[in-house]
Amino acid sequence: MEASSVLPCKWCTHLQGLLLTASFLTCCHLPTTAQITIELEPPQVIEGENVLIRVNNLTENLITLAWFRGMRIKSPQIGQYTPATKVTVLGPGHSGRETLYSNGSLQIYNVTQEDIGFYSLRIINKHAEIVSITSIYLNVYSSLWTCEHPSPHAKLTIESVPPGISEGGSVLLLVKNLPQNLLSLFWYKGVIAVKKFEIARHIKATNSSVPGPAHTGRETVFSNGSLLLQEVMQSDTGFYTLRTMSTDLKDEVAHVQLYMDTYLLTCYHPLQVKIESLPQNVAVGKTVLLLVHNLPEDFQAFFWYKSAYRRDTYKIAEYKRAMDATILGSAYSSREFIYNNGSMLIIDVTEDDAGYFLLEILREDLKIEKAYIQLHVNSFVSNSKDSASTARLSIESVPPSIVEGGSVLLLVHNLPKNLQSLFWYKGMIAEKKSELIQHIIATSSSLPGPAHSGRETVYNNGSLLLQRVMQNDTQFYTLQTMDTDLKYEVAHVQLQLDTSLSTWYHPLQVKIESLPRNVAVGKSVLFLVHNFPEVFRAFSWYKPAYKSHTSKIVEYHRFTDSATVGAAYRGIEVIFTNGSMVMIDVTEDDAGFYMLEILREDFKVEKAYVQLHVNSFVPNSKVSVSTARLSIESVPPSIVGGESVLLLVHNLPKNLQSLFWYKGVIAEEKSELIQHIIATSSSLPGPAHSGRETVYSNGSLLLQRVMQNDTGFYTLLTMSTDLKDEIAHVQLQLDTSTCCSLLTSDQLIIVPVPRNIAVGKSVLLLVCNVPKDVQTIFWYKSVYRTDIFKIAEYSRSMESTIWGLAHSGKEMVYTNGSLLIQNVTEHDAGLYMLEILHKDYKLERAHVQVHVNNPVSWPFVRVTDTTVRVQSSVVFTCFSADPGVSIRWLFNKQSLQLTERMTLSPSKCQLSIDPVWREDAGKYQCEVSNPVSSKSSLPVRLAVIEE
């Protein structure tokens, strides 16, 4: 870092709090004929090093120069030097580690954290007047970690290499920061270090290993403490414990968890910035929220564009974090509202708002991250001139799906103006036994009904609040209104639990999914049945959702494998033996509720409901078929890592000449996956082709063995014989709701989601394979069952939670046994134990380790010389205050491509180039990262000159 220019003194104290790395300021209080400057050598200082505060441009006629610790008049003096007499006088601020030189420079030896602060040089003339005051700020890096010299206080850790392993492969449990005075070490299978679980022990003095009772013959211990496990099997997954003993008989313990890689692929991908459209389909005139998930904490600014391209003409707004200010762009329509979490609200949506939006994020390290969202806008077709007066009663679930134990608001829209009373019912049928509550408008009073559980509250606007939601609350809810002229109106809403948390562990209920969720007139819809019982006698479909002869569509008998159509059958329905039903050429009359009734083998009846939403199709020409737009469907909608997905193309142009598939939303050559020529029925792979993509003659793209980096948008570009282009997009998503289902054993296991947590974030300790006969669940912040470590105790029969001594107020227990920890701190890291008490009073235990990381701080780079000759050598060193970071070197802002002349130290913190060539000239940086963040150093420029 070069010396800064002279600044007015009033800025010195303001800038002090902004100096985050070893840095300095100079500040001249008084005018002087020669500008005195001071600089640090080296610019960045680490604990234990020496630093020289060099003085430049000293005048010859000075009488005395004095160094002070601070910037105030009464700051303690370190010492003063008089050139005429060559006498140095030490002051009260001298610590015994400072030396004053005749050129005015100050040397500080063996710097510590206590040396951080301002240092001031005062020049005094023969009249005992202060001619100038020059100040500099010294910051000292912690010595917790320096290049290739780990701190003696560094904690023992273990890393799984690779993080996940395929069955039959090998994995190295790599040990870091072994104690220097190591006597012996022991490896155990599990979290408790007891003899019966001992895999092997290693004696340092003799460099020998002895197998233990849990040794399978596939484990090898190395002299650095690491454990190699070969021919890995499913039963090898779980925790491993390392215990070390030093020569002073001190013990240290570390744990690591071994996962199968197919599991990690789906459940532990890095958090990407994603945008969610709420609602997914918005009507003209309504409001939509483009909700941003996983916005990075270290962003400088973000930009919204009404396009998939970054152009000023498409810019809606720019938000600058430092100023907390929003700058509006050319595409701003005055209907957009920007939030500092990156989200954008659009009100009074029009058809012109449909299409792609781009969110661009500028991070602290000047890296750019992009995310895209497609907004779907549906035209509202009114049957009258006064659409407001004919607005239908409707209900919205806020949020759309709810975590068990949370609250949900069933928000009512378009209540009649002359409302007299309203009634809420649980289920599809408005009958007295299922009445939750009734509300009288005139008296603003509510009366609970037979189905009221004490958790329901109705508001004056008709909305219903349901608190502490349970599994049996999930179903349809019915609202019936009565106005003053005694007219009735009915609306329904379906309450759904968030299946990413709580619904995995309850008996699987039959559910029906509408594909698509909103269907246009003339299109087809599939009512896809989930969790259909394997053993059943018959099933029947009804429209509307009441069991009567007039409403029956069809009845299927398994024994005879035959179907009997009912009075409501229209000839457009096709049923399948798994209970699902397809309807073709849908009309507006098909909208509404449908009921599936299943007669089980034990003659029990099970019912499921689905609501069909039909959108009017307004063609722009008399021949609407010819204007059908190119579209793509992901089959299935979301995919588990390692499986295959088909991007199914609809409505290809008839005069198609060729088509091109791209990875991303922009059709550019570098992102081209494959092109297909219709005339020759041949395909050519593009630069982005991975060998896993196959294109079919109907334009569809098959992607096999899907990985995390395959997620995102895909673009199809078609070219017809008249050279017209058409473009369609589709988004591929990984299904993370199958984390537990990926486990091949039925053993009780806990999964931390996410695997690595940043300080201040939340982590879910997700429990898999919870037995059905659970009586009580206990959580402990320890591997031992002790009251002082107890977080919570949950009784399933009483549906109540008793908090323990270790409860911090940040934990939440779900009925499926999972534990949510919010606002995580470093103290939350470590091992947790789940203990389950069965109804037969047997105990079952499972453990999980929580890894908590602080965001990394800024690193810096030192170089042996910034100007070197060709054929000489140079060494760059990366310094970071953070332990356990990964290091990557950058050259001219690109990842450094190592040559045979370049050597990295074991931890990659040192880069040596020998010999140096002319092409090595440029800017060098190091990037440090941990599982939750990364930062890059300021660039150091290397100049290369000829001999």
UniProtKB/Swiss-Prot annotation:
Localization terms from the record: Cell membrane; Apical cell membrane; Cell surface
Entry's Gene Ontology molecular function annotations: identical protein binding
Domain (Ig-like C2-type): residue spans on this chain: 859-943
Disulfide bond annotation, renumbered to this chain: C878-C926
Subunit architecture: Homodimer.
Protein name listed in UniProt: Cell adhesion molecule CEACAM5
GO biological process: apoptotic process; heterophilic cell-cell adhesion via plasma membrane cell adhesion molecules; homophilic cell adhesion via plasma membrane adhesion molecules
Signal peptide: 1-34
Gene source species: Mus musculus (Mouse)
Cellular component annotations (GO), alphabetically ordered: apical plasma membrane; cell surface; membrane; side of membrane
